[in-house]
């Protein structure tokens, strides 16, 4: 909690108005003590009681964004094997990012929605989904609950639509962190991040960018005239640009 209030003070001192916090890491551990039963049942719950600190931060008119890892959840994939994303041979898929979970898995879907609803109730204004994608390796994947053979894009879009639909009544803003390659239409078939669909589903599209590529990325995503890139495209940058919406990662 003290770290949260210190971070909020730093944001205000820097002239910012929002704080982006990783609340569910790819490893699976939560950054707060959750009341969602599945978190305790599988030993992934955090210990921090954040309610008072969040009230303090909100009192400073700071906009709070929670980053929630979706398709990478190492601990859950290990501890509840049925949730793991499978290779064609039936083994759990893992890589340098961690253990991946099946985007069609009902447990994973309802767990994510429950966590996001709780974050909203705690005072978060927005959730940004990280790892809303599939692995970039060309390994053949198997979605255990699906009788057909959906593509990676099918899988990512299906999860995105589920999350959007089931959180719409909360008033929580829902965004996605996508890769620069997906915006530039590179590796999109592997990642499953269909940029003709995701910007239409989410309130904002976030991307880790650099000073060298941020304008190219913004132009690419702004090619869809229905997408207001000035307010809905949010680059994560090491250094603040002169204007526009952005998040600094320092």
Regions found by a protein language model. Name each.
Residues 32-41, 73-95, 137-147:
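Aromatic- and acidic-residue-enriched segments that line the glycan-binding/catalytic groove
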Residues 3-29, 118-128, 198-206:
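Catalytic domains of carbohydrate-active enzymes, especially glycoside hydrolases
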């Amino acid at each position: 909690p003290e770290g949260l209030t210190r971070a909020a003070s730093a944001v205000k001192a820097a002239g910012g108005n929002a704080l982006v916090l990783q609340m569910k890491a790819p490893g699976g551990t939560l950054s707060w003590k959750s009341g969602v039963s599945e978190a305790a049942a599988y030993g992934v719950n955090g210990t921090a009681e954040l309610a008072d600190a969040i009230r303090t931060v909100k009192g400073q008119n700071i906009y709070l964004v929670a980053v929630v890892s979706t398709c990478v959840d190492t601990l859950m994939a290990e501890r509840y094997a049925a949730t793991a994303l499978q290779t064609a041979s039936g083994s759990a898929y893992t890589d340098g990012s961690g253990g991946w979970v099946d985007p069609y898995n009902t447990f994973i879907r309802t767990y994510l929605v429950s966590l996001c609803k709780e974050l909203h109730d705690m005072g978060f204004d927005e959730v940004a989904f990280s790892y809303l994608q599939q692995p970039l390796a060309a390994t053949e994947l198997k979605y255990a609950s699906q009788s057909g053979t959906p593509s990676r894009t099918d899988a990512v879009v299906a999860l995105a639509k589920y999350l959007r639909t089931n959180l719409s009544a909360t008033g929580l803003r829902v965004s996605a962190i996508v890769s620069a390659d997906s915006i530039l239409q590179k590796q999109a078939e592997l990642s499953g991040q269909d940029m003709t669909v995701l910007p239409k589903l989410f309130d904002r599209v976030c991307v880790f960018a650099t000073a060298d590529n941020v304008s190219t990325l913004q132009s690419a995503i702004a090619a869809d005239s229905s997408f207001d890139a000035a307010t809905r495209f949010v680059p994560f940058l090491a250094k603040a640009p002169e204007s526009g919406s952005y998040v600094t990662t320092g």
